[in-house]
Amino acid sequence: MDKFRVQGPTKLQGEVTISGAKNAALPILFAALLAEEPVEIQNVPKLKDVDTSMKLLSQLGAKVERNGSVHIDARDVNVFCAPYDLVKTMRASIWALGPLVARFGQGQVSLPGGCTIGARPVDLHISGLEQLGATIKLEEGYVKASVDGRLKGAHIVMDKVSVGATVTIMCAATLAEGTTIIENAAREPEIVDTANFLITLGAKISGQGTDRIVIEGVERLGGGVYRVLPDRIETGTFLVAAAISRGKIICRNTQPDTLDAVLAKLRDAGADIEVGEDWISLDMHGKRPKAVNVRTAPHPAFPTDMQAQFTLLNLVAEGTGFITETVFENRFMHVPELSRMGAHAEIESNTVICHGVEKLSGAQVMATDLRASASLVLAGCIAEGTTVVDRIYHIDRGYERIEDKLRALGANIERVKGE
């Protein structure tokens, strides 16, 4: 397994170009299964999960090519099963189920893998599809969905806010007979992006970005060209990198209005922030950040995917900060690793109490999930001495060329190839 070796401390400053959003690209790739004409998807990040998704679409019979953009022609899809060997590494494969059953009347997906963060059940996906008229069976580790004729529109009230299930229901409902209303829908920018992609193909969707999405079913979806929105979590990660190293950064090709909660907390931490139409600049003027209190919650509140990075910020900040995680359980696995580097933190239930220290020291640490691993790499950039981050395949699932981008900002980081 590959590792990162990071030599610190360094001040991170300069410019970085943000990639397309993984959390929008994946649902959009699977939504392309609904299209009866070719689609072109631009600004798709080069990531492990994207490669796996493209491989899965190919196995289902779609023609998939990548030459800058990703081109998908799903006209000849003739396999309706997403097998375990591909699904085991990536939870997003559940998103194949809605499009398959909506367009072809059948689909089966192996129960998924991915990051090990607490309970991420597929129940909400299943109950949503059942309310649209699908018959669901769980057999031999597979979720099997089928319907006679078309799915039927329904009024669906989500038990809890779920990005994944909102995507599944919205995609399936585009080809259902009649109108579907999703109440308590997720409001994330990536949901809006997926809806806008479907609209490009001819879907009738309104209310995306609110907690009530209305989908009027259509007979078929055509093709089109669509550009994936920039990755707000990658943007936030690089802004934190500059903040903790007391540096200065400009993030280009980003979308500032998707990051309001994060920018507010960075300002609270003492950062000088300016935004343009597609750029954000952050300048710490050489100052140490101040500790902030953060509570994660569904969008538009503070994103859980920025929690680990702000935990790190608090651990090197002036003062004491509280970080409360309300979205996922078991999402503080980075804290013991950061403690090995000299951080001072206590975990009480779903809150981590961070007592800022002047400096961290390099150590051997292990990545446990995608965002936690990013925080360990950033910690290595500002720690004194050498940090080795193990199991970085987690990072490769969600960050495109992170070491190249950090190196361009002044980091001393190298990838050590595993056996």
Swiss-Prot record:
Catalytically driven reaction(s):
phosphoenolpyruvate + UDP-N-acetyl-alpha-D-glucosamine = UDP-N-acetyl-3-O-(1-carboxyvinyl)-alpha-D-glucosamine + phosphate
In the record, 2-(S-cysteinyl)pyruvic acid O-phosphothioketal modifications are located at: C115
What Pfam family is a match for this entry? Answer: EPSP_synthase
Task: Locate the residues binding phosphoenolpyruvate.
Answer: K22, N23
Listed GO CC annotations: cytoplasm
Q: Which InterPro entries match?
A: Enolpyruvate_Tfrase_dom, Enolpyruvate_Tfrase_sf, MurA_subfamily, RNA3'P_cycl/enolpyr_Trfase_a/b, UDP_GlcNAc_COvinyl_MurA
Q: Pathway, per UniProt?
A: Cell wall biogenesis; peptidoglycan biosynthesis
Keywords for the protein's UniProt record, in alphabetical order: Cell cycle, Cell division, Cell shape, Cell wall biogenesis/degradation, Cytoplasm, Peptidoglycan synthesis, Pyruvate, Transferase
**Compartment(s) of residence:** Cytoplasm
Return the EC number.
Answer: 2.5.1.7
Instruction: Tell me the function of this protein.
Output: Cell wall formation. Adds enolpyruvyl to UDP-N-acetylglucosamine.
Superkingdom in the source lineage: Bacteria
Q: Name the family the entry cites.
A: Belongs to the EPSP synthase family. MurA subfamily.
Q: Which GO terms describe its biological process?
A: cell division; cell wall organization; peptidoglycan biosynthetic process; regulation of cell shape; UDP-N-acetylgalactosamine biosynthetic process
The protein's organism comes out as Escherichia coli O157:H7
Chief localization: cytoplasm
What name does this protein carry? UDP-N-acetylglucosamine 1-carboxyvinyltransferase
